[in-house]
């Protein structure tokens, strides 16, 4: 009798779950019909011509604004700009610059880059790009950057004002791949203490870190200071690879979990190159996401000291969803947790403020 009752209970549970799923599907379909009908009505009945692309983008943005602050929409151009720092390179002329008094000042040309090769120097002021004046005309930094960047192999003509030279200098620069490095610095502070500063967690970060680590160990480094101040994060895998260098085999680095994403755990492999020796991780209020994964793993396993200010508090995992026109939604699909089970995500209200 008990067996029959148990089976009956399981069947009732099964059918209840099925009914709930069917109801959820029906509700979703109803909402989609509602949205499609609204779009159809505006496109076909509104009194004036409408910009369909703008309306759709506004609808997407409106939906995401009802979620968390990190679920965002980016158009195709914004996606390209967003990915460049993490991919490790972009096509351009290879200069670092500042805008001052409505003029582009070259801070320094990238070593070995196309601008340095043709003779552009630190302190030069670029005033014209392809016969278009960019100085003193209130042109936005974005517009100037767009004019200077371009596919590898294409050329751009610039005119430069240089201190001590009376006439304008003309240069033709052939654009090339410009590397963007993840490491700002790596050097020996004492005969035994090394220092490495990582500014982002990108596609080349682990490779750059390993090269720096090997070089410093070759100079006698025993202890390491890892600086993550101002590092706003980047790729999850890059953070896991860096943390792996400090932890013992089988030690949990981080795990992620969400409503539709079951718990996923990431462990150290045991092949790290700095598992012994002291470790200090420097952080500040701008250290976020991937930086907090590394710092959290080091702290929870008591592998080293975490020194600095309270970190930013971004404990969410975004999934990039590519759209047909090259635009993208970054949708929060899970939270990440440190080995001790801490979710360091701060309240959304404090982010918006």
Question: Where are the model-predicted features located?
Answer:
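Bacterial Sec-dependent N-terminal signal peptides
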Residues: 1-28
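Cleft-lining beta-strand/loop regions that shape enzyme active-site pockets
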Residues: 21-31, 35-52, 75, 105-108, ...
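An acidic helix/loop motif centered on a single conserved Asp/Glu
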Residues: 50-68
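PDZ/PDZ-like peptide-tail recognition elements
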Residues: 58, 70-108
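Structural motif
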Residues: 123-125
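Short acidic, Pro/Gly- and aromatic-enriched capping/linker segments at domain boundaries
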Residues: 323-334
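Conserved functional hotspot residues or short segments at active or partner-binding sites
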Residues: 339-353
